[in-house]
C-alpha cells in the first residue's frame, strides 16, 4: 500500500522494550522518552506483524531499548518468521550477543546491526556509563560465526567520536562488516553541541570510493565501497531524500503505530484494539494515511 505521497510501505521497525543494560548519554529510546503502557506479548507482536503483510511489509527490524533483554526474543522472531518476510534484522548494543547469537539464528533471525561508536575501552565505558567493549567485540565475532550476516556496525557520528572513524573503518574492513555512519539527532537542547555535519564526511568517502551504489528502496541511500569496505550513511536531519523515499512504519513497545521517525504526535494505537478483538487493519490504514515527509523540498 502507498501513502498519500506515493511511498510504498515495505519495512516495519519494532521497538519491543524500552529497557536497556547501558545508559548512553545520547539515547532517545526510539522517540519514546518515558515508559508508558503495557509491554506487548510475543503473540501480540506476531499478530500485528501478520496484519502488516497485507500492506506491503516484507522487511522487519527489531530494536529497543535493548531487544536482547527480552527473554522471549527467540519466540518473537519465530512468531514473525514466514515466507512473505524477506529479511528479519535486529539492532543491538552487542553486550549480550555472544550468549544469544546462536538461539537467534535458530529462531530465524537473518542479520544484526551492532552499535559501536568507539574502539577505545575507556571512552566506550564513558559513553555507555559502564559498558564493556570486549563483550561487544566478542558478540560481533559470535554473530559472524553463526551467520547473522551481513553484519552492520552502527557508528554514531558525534563531536566526541568522529576521531574514531578511521579505526572503526579498519575494524569493519578486518572483520568483514558493513559500516553504517549515522547522523546524531539531538533530542534535547543540551545535546546539540554534539551534532556533527556528516555531509563532508560522506563527500570525502565518496571522493575516495572505488564503487558507488544507490539503494533504491532505502531512501535512495548511497553505498560506497572503499578498499573493500562497504560504507553507508543515515542522515535523517533536514534530508528530503531520506523522507521522500521512506518506506518504513514503526511500532512502539507499548503498541502504537508510528508513521514517522521524527514525530511523536500522530501515533496510532493498535495494541488495545487488538486486545479488544477488533480488526486492526483499519489502524494500519490510518497510520499510512498519517504519513507525510517530515522534510519537504
Swiss-Prot record:
Its cofactor is [4Fe-4S] cluster. One of its GO terms (biological process) is Mo-molybdopterin cofactor biosynthetic process. Coiled coil: none annotated. It comes from the Archaea. Binds 2 [4Fe-4S] clusters. Binds 1 [4Fe-4S] cluster coordinated with 3 cysteines and an exchangeable S-adenosyl-L-methionine and 1 [4Fe-4S] cluster coordinated with 3 cysteines and the GTP-derived substrate. Residues 4-227 form the Radical SAM core domain. The keyword Metal-binding applies. [4Fe-4S] cluster 2 binds at residues 243, 246, 260. Gene3D superfamilies: Aldolase class I (3.20.20.70). Pfam families: Fer4_12, Mob_synth_C, Radical_SAM. Pathway: Cofactor biosynthesis; molybdopterin biosynthesis. [4Fe-4S] cluster 1 binds at residues 20, 24, 27. It is an enzyme of class 4 (lyase). GO terms for molecular function: 4 iron, 4 sulfur cluster binding; cyclic pyranopterin monophosphate synthase activity; GTP 3',8'-cyclase activity; GTP binding; metal ion binding; S-adenosyl-L-methionine binding. GTP binds at residues 13, 61, 91, 152, 248-250. Its EC number is 4.1.99.22. It catalyses: GTP + AH2 + S-adenosyl-L-methionine = (8S)-3',8-cyclo-7,8-dihydroguanosine 5'-triphosphate + 5'-deoxyadenosine + L-methionine + A + H(+). S-adenosyl-L-methionine binds at residues 26, 65, 115. Keywords: 4Fe-4S, GTP-binding, Iron, Iron-sulfur, Lyase, Metal-binding, Molybdenum cofactor biosynthesis, Nucleotide-binding, S-adenosyl-L-methionine. Catalyzes the cyclization of GTP to (8S)-3',8-cyclo-7,8-dihydroguanosine 5'-triphosphate. Belongs to the radical SAM superfamily. MoaA family. This is Probable GTP 3',8-cyclase. It comes from Methanococcus maripaludis (strain DSM 14266 / JCM 13030 / NBRC 101832 / S2 / LL).
Amino acid at each position: 500500500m502507498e501513502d498519500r505521497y506515493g511511498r510504498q510501505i515495505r519495512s516495519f521497525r519494532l521497538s519491543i522494550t524500552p529497557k536497556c543494560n547501558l545508559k548512553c548519554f545520547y539515547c532517545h529510546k526510539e522517540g519514546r522518552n518515558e515508559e508508558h503502557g503495557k509491554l506487548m506479548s510475543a503473540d501480540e507482536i506476531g499478530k500485528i506483524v501478520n496484519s502488516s503483510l497485507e500492506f506491503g511489509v516484507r522487511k522487519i527490524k527489531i530494536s529497543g531499548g535493548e531487544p536482547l533483554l527480552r527473554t522471549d526474543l527467540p519466540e518473537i522472531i519465530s512468531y514473525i518468521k514466514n515466507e512473505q518476510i524477506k529479511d528479519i534484522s535486529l539492532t543491538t548494543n552487542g553486550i549480550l550477543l555472544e550468549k544469544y547469537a546462536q538461539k537467534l539464528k535458530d529462531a530465524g533471525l537473518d542479520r544484526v546491526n551492532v552499535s559501536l561508536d568507539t574502539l577505545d575501552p575507556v571512552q566506550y565505558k564513558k559513553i555507555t556509563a559502564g559498558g564493556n567493549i570486549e563483550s561487544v567485540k566478542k558478540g560481533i565475532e559470535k554473530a559472524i560465526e553463526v551467520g547473522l550476516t551481513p553484519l552492520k556496525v552502527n557508528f554514531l557520528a558525534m563531536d566526541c567520536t568522529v576521531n574514531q572513524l578511521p579505526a572503526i573503518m579498519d575494524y569493519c574492513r578486518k572483520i568483514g562488516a558493513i559500516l553504517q555512519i549515522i547522523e546524531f539527532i539531538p533530542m534535547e537542547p543540551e545535546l546539540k553541541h554534539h551534532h556533527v555535519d556528516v555531509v563532508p564526511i560522506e563527500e570525502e568517502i565518496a571522493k575516495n570510493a572505488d564503487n558507488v551504489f544507490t539503494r533504491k528502496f532505502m531512501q535512495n541511500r548511497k553505498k560506497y565501497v572503499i578498499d573493500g569496505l562497504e560504507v553507508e550513511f543515515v542522515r535523517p536531519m533536514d534530508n528530503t531524500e531520506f523522507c521522500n523515499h521512506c518506506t518504513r512504519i514503526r511500532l512502539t513497545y507499548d503498541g502504537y503505530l508510528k508513521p514517522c521517525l521524527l514525530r511523536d504526535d500522530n501515533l496510532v494505537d493498535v495494541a488495545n484494539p487488538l486486545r479488544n478483538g477488533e480488526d486492526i487493519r483499519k489502524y494500519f490504514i490510518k497510520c499510512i494515511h498519517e504519513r507525510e515527509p517530515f522534510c519537504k523540498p
